[in-house]
Amino acid sequence: MKLKLRWKGHQRFLTRQNSLVGFIWSPLKNTFSKRNSILNNQVCFEAIKYIQRHYFSSQSHHVTYLHQSPLEKLVSNGVVNENGDLTMDSLSHQIYLLHKNRPTLPLKPTNQPTRFASVLMPLVNTSQGASLLLTQRSPNLRSHAGQMCFPGGRVEPSDGSHYYAALRETYEEIGFLPNFFTYLTTFPPLFTRDEKTEIRAYLAFSVQTSLPSLGTGEVKDLFYVPLTSFLNPKHQKISRFRNTDLLYVEFNIDKIPRIWGITAVILNMYLNSICPDALISIPKF
């Protein structure tokens, strides 16, 4: 029987104990450690080689891939283990895939941005398997009211780096401490419609096993969305990005507000890299 939590009228799933909880995060190394052994999760070559040695041949893999369920696609790509959870090996392989299939955006700014923003894409293990944490903005905000997004915000001069700005904003918005996260990779920058703001997205993993708290009035609600939900074709819809020629897939998932705009474009880049052909008719970013 699954343990569920009713919160703000929505169904929430408590995060469960997972295979990474036994490891601790080393701030100096920015990676996992257990006892006296430091495990480099950024470039875990041994794990990558192991996964590659046990892969199916590319041709037979592609034939069966088209008929697989979302979970089977994630497993066959080494993104999660057979139970649908994130492990050290699967996280290392995600980094490998995101660098191998690094997305590029066809839209380039014509002007230099004058403002900078950063968002964090928190990967966590929940009772529904590997999931991403997204927030819903307050309906009282002047911009992007009520929209779904990743935690983040404007880069301040005191932040020191774009990544730290994403960590700071995440803590202020939902209560996740910076040392809860292990950095995985960075995505190509995106730009607002007026090209004045550059947005950088950072993928990070957290072993946090309890629900965070909403720290400011900017966030109305938060959602743990399983990766399998994003890969379900029934939840996908082609959309056009802000009066441009850029097509992308937005997500309409049961009991979760519509995910569209820049947040959906970031998700497209991520999912298209770790599970090629898993989204419907998306452009090649």
UniProtKB/Swiss-Prot annotation:
The keyword Oxidoreductase does not apply. It is an enzyme of class 3 (hydrolase). Residues 114-254 form the Nudix hydrolase domain. A motif (Nudix box) lies at residues 153-175. Its EC number is 3.6.1.-. GO terms for biological process: cellular detoxification; coenzyme A catabolic process; nucleoside diphosphate metabolic process. This is Probable nudix hydrolase C6G9.05. It comes from Schizosaccharomyces pombe (strain 972 / ATCC 24843). Keywords: Hydrolase, Magnesium, Manganese, Metal-binding. GO terms for cellular component: mitochondrion; peroxisome. The lineage of its organism: Eukaryota, Fungi, Dikarya, Ascomycota, Taphrinomycotina. Pfam families: NUDIX (PF00293). Its cofactor is Mn(2+); Mg(2+). Belongs to the Nudix hydrolase family. PCD1 subfamily. The keyword Disulfide bond does not apply. One of its GO terms (molecular function) is magnesium ion binding.
